[in-house]
Amino acid sequence: MSSDNNDNNNNHSYKEANYYNYYRLLENNLKKKSRGLFLTENNKKKSKVFKLTKFSIDTEINDCSSTSKWTQIYSNDSKTPIEARYKIPLHPTWIITDFRVESQDKVVVLIGKIKEHEKALNNYNDTIANGGQSFLASKSSIEDLDFFNLNIGNLPPNETVKITLTITSEIGTHINGQLHYYLHHSLFPTYNFNFNLNIIIKLSNSIESIINWYGNSKRILNINSSNTGCGSDDGDDDVIKVLYNNSNNKEIKIKSNDKLNSIEDSLVLIIQPSIINDEPKSMIEYNKIENSLAVSINYYSSFKDIKIEDMNQKSEFIFLIDCSGSMVGEPMRKVKRAMEIIIRSLNENQHRVNVVCFGSSFKKVFKVSRDYNDETLECLSKYIQSIEANLGGTELLTPIKNILSSPPNPEYPRQLFILTDGEAPHRDKIIHYLSKESNTTRIFTYGIGDSVDIDLIIGLSNACKGHYEFITDNDNFEKQVMKLLNISLKPMFSNIKLDLSTLFSNNKNKNKNNNNCKEDIIIQSPSQIRPLFYQERMIVYLMIESLSTRLKDIINDSIENSKPLIITMTCDGPKGDKLSIPIELDLKNNCIISSSSSSSSSSSSSSSSSSSSSSSSSSSSSSTTTATTNQNQIHRLSAYHQIKDLEEKERKKKKDNKTRIVELSKKYGILSKHTSFIVKCESTKPTLESMDFIDIIDQFSFENQVSATKNKSQCLLTKSKKSKTAAPTTTTTTTITKKRFSDVDEDISRQSVKKSKKSETKEETTKTTSSKTKSSSSFDLIDLLRIQRANGSWTKSTISQMGISIGNAPVELSSDQLYNIWVTLIVISKIIKLFPNEKIEYEFAIQKSKKWVKLELSKLNLPNTTFDKFSLKANSLC
């Protein structure tokens, strides 16, 4: 998200959220905005006799997920049987967990069965060929975007059919702990139909506010009226109305306007909890029939009471710089200056760093990121000064793949900064690739100039849950660059692991059979936990598919005696310390006990319509302190993330995990890329008439990538284009010595780094002009930062060369060994006094310096007030 767009009241701020990236790609790639049951040209006449007539959505939202029941009624008013096919977008977090079909006479409800896709498709075709009815629900991908496909086979004339889907999803999250519920307009037909939306929000904390967006219309819902009739003051034309809220605002019911007969725009609810719990929360499901346990853990930390000077967290910083021909001149000069400031804002013994330049090819300074120290800093500084815009075009995917091919180090969370001024081929392919890497890398992007591809910059950062900036004003270049660095240096938890050994250590039978229940296989998903960055939410699932006798005893004892079980989250904290955070599993008051089979909804069966249960209703459970969920919801979310892990292993290691994916899909009734829901309705009176075929499967046709990226309405800030060819240069040579920097990339160390005389002259001219505006100083801020050491200090020898008067040091610092402490205090004061308007540029470098001074003073056993006393003296001399 943009660092400028963190205000809740910003227009369409929900589009900055990471979950929205899927819809951005969808909108950018759709050839036309057709969706749902919008028919192709050949079938427009048939659309009058076959259509969706009713569509209702019943949703329940809790602290971390939502469950929705979609009920759709289709009508065939023609004189012939119909076979219809259509598709709707399927967000990556959506899980189709139930598929039911109800006939017109309402005698039976047919429940879909999960089968491998090929077998399900054969069953579908065979049933139709024999004159019966069949319904097929499947998942597909187009241009790396997932879709849900529904085939309605052999619907007799003058009949209706009701189709019900259950969709489980993690709730969308955004800044300040917001929860977002989003319905994109492409989910709905373009014609009128009867629409009904009912939402129940049940949170563990009270709700402060709910904002409703419908297209460009924004409205703050009235949730603080009397317990009933909260929407009585709402206008007749409002899309959403509040029906009910309880006294503590933890439960709120919302419904759509009864007059709503179409959905022309996207609809979003932004739910703001009043309190953000600064501790992990758990939700538990205990399935007695399946003998299984599933746990979801969600954690949003405010990182309160963390002072900047106390922070000592580790991170890896990689800077990927566009050196294509269009960056020649002022853009490259600005990038180089910004990079000089950035590399001096990092910290010794905390950070690792690397710089990669890309164009038609790419070059890395180091083969792998190096520890940040004086040698690394010197090498990077020389290299940055030598960078030119001479690498041709903008081939971004290759260097990104190279960077991400290195396994992430959990102790050094990887943060990638991309600086570019143009477009990149295969934009959506790059974004899709990065979306698979969000657990390994966080990405920050800078769009430089007026011709940058907006969707590339936003898409790259959102794919890996990062932030972005557009830089069109050269005067604020460095300030905007430093904004994102500021975010990257905020507190976080890294190297997160769940210690489950404590799960068995606080029960009365702990001395019996003391093997920590080794027979209990506990599956964590996702298997790799993303660092918990500032203003992010962590959600992790645990599942035990078959409980041992001992663990069942532990669970029952916990329930009977109100004795919570404990698991421990270990991590590296912002202060550089190892943290152990207990997580309570309160099975007495916060556990849903299920008595149904996980796979019951995916078995082929029929039941009376009266026995059809609503997915949005609460399952039977003991009294809970958090919102209840539907039966086996946490089991299914856990299984879904296991499937995602297996698919990722297939992608990276070329390993075939189809068998296990199909097994999980069948057991938990989850639609996957290898499976489909199939419903067959064998008829005693087979339909022998020929069917009319309504082919609406190709409605989501895509432009090719080249035309998509060139579409000015989607990509560009202006119509202007910059050349992507390398600018001709006259060169001089600066050599990086391989002997000293033995791990410098061979391509860099072999070559002579060329520097353009033309660029050099322009830089000196600009620098001279700039220096005239400085407050009576004969040097620029960057001149002082260039001679700063990696630990934040300055030395007497380097400062003397610049003609800076140091004055007499305090007696305590007058020895040669301590004199650099005084020198550093003098330079800090000089910078603050001479460059008051550039604070954001030097802020981190000065913080580093102050931290070093305080550390050195602490070794001398001087009073706590010594730093302030010496700083005042230094200020008086400047």
UniProtKB/Swiss-Prot annotation:
Pfam families: VIT, VWA_3
Segments forming domain VIT: 36-169
InterPro entries xref list: VIT (IPR013694), VWF_A (IPR002035), vWFA_dom_sf (IPR036465)
Compositionally biased spans, kind Polar residues: 624-635
Domain of life: Eukaryota
Alphabetized PANTHER family for the sequence: VON WILLEBRAND FACTOR A DOMAIN-CONTAINING PROTEIN 5A (PTHR45737), VON WILLEBRAND FACTOR A DOMAIN-CONTAINING PROTEIN DDB_G0267758-RELATED (PTHR45737:SF1)
SMART domains assigned to the protein according to its UniProt record, in alphabetical order: VIT (SM00609), VWA (SM00327)
Gene3D superfamilies: von Willebrand factor, type A domain (3.40.50.410)
SUPFAM superfamilies named among the record's database cross-references: vWA-like
Low complexity: compositionally biased ranges: 595-623
Residue ranges constituting the VWFA domain according to the UniProt record: 316-496
Entry protein name: von Willebrand factor A domain-containing protein DDB_G0267758
Region ranges (Disordered): 595-638, 752-774
